[in-house]
Amino acid sequence: MGAYKYLEELERKKQSDVLRFLQRVRVWEYRQKNVIHRAARPTRPDKARRLGYKAKQGFVIYRVRVRRGNRKRPVPKGATYGKPTNQGVNELKYQRSLRATAEERVGRRAANLRVLNSYWVNQDSTYKYFEVILVDPQHKAIRRDARYNWICNPVHKHREARGLTATGKKSRGINKGHKFNNTKAGRRKTWKRQNTLSLWRYRK
């Protein structure tokens, strides 16, 4: 069994004494740092590698913290100017994950890089902490690598903002196999197709 397998098993038992102590120490360290900061190396190398990270030039890791809880509707003085059914401000549940939010914020900070993937590293009562894997599309080491040079294509700019990363696709309900045919072509398109009555006229 390789070293990464042992790391994976350690991470799996998050309630063990070792991991609980380690997480407490790490979360204290993360709290002292900026909201978005660059990490020298991945905290979970086994997870990062499974998501596509390589310890070579052109790959960058950023760590980010996102506030936990609901998303408050940004309206001045709580005035939504609508019907009572739509007047909620506080108890609204954001339809995307905090991980997707983390990716988007890092993507805005490092606009010259492309977001490849991300993963959870820690959490406390107030924040969740994620590490985001970014790739430099201008770097020769990436452009010459047949496995990764697809991300250099301009259509992959800000893929995290368009729900094209793994967590973005998950919140869009996009996957393969049984039960996933209801989100074909997107949520709104599916709703429109299923709620539009179309009566075809046939002429001889």
Curated annotation (Swiss-Prot):
Region listing for Disordered, in residue ranges: 165-185
Key word Hydrolase present: no
GO cellular component: cytoplasm; cytosol; cytosolic large ribosomal subunit; nucleolus; nucleus
Compartments (UniProt record): Cytoplasm
SUPFAM superfamilies membership: Ribosomal proteins S24e, L23 and L15e
First and last residue of the signal peptide: none
Keywords annotated in UniProt: Cytoplasm, Ribonucleoprotein, Ribosomal protein
Residues forming coiled coils: none
Entry superkingdom: Eukaryota
Pfam family, one: Ribosomal_L15e
Disulfide-bond pairs as recorded: none
GO BP field: cytoplasmic translation; macroautophagy
GO MF terms, alphabetically ordered: RNA binding; structural constituent of ribosome
Other notes: Present with 721 molecules/cell in log phase SD medium. There are 2 genes for eL15 in yeast.
Role, per record: Component of the ribosome, a large ribonucleoprotein complex responsible for the synthesis of proteins in the cell. The small ribosomal subunit (SSU) binds messenger RNAs (mRNAs) and translates the encoded message by selecting cognate aminoacyl-transfer RNA (tRNA) molecules. The large subunit (LSU) contains the ribosomal catalytic site termed the peptidyl transferase center (PTC), which catalyzes the formation of peptide bonds, thereby polymerizing the amino acids delivered by tRNAs into a polypeptide chain.
Assembly information from the UniProt record: Component of the large ribosomal subunit (LSU). Mature yeast ribosomes consist of a small (40S) and a large (60S) subunit. The 40S small subunit contains 1 molecule of ribosomal RNA (18S rRNA) and 33 different proteins (encoded by 57 genes). The large 60S subunit contains 3 rRNA molecules (25S, 5.8S and 5S rRNA) and 46 different proteins (encoded by 81 genes).
Protein known as: Large ribosomal subunit protein eL15B
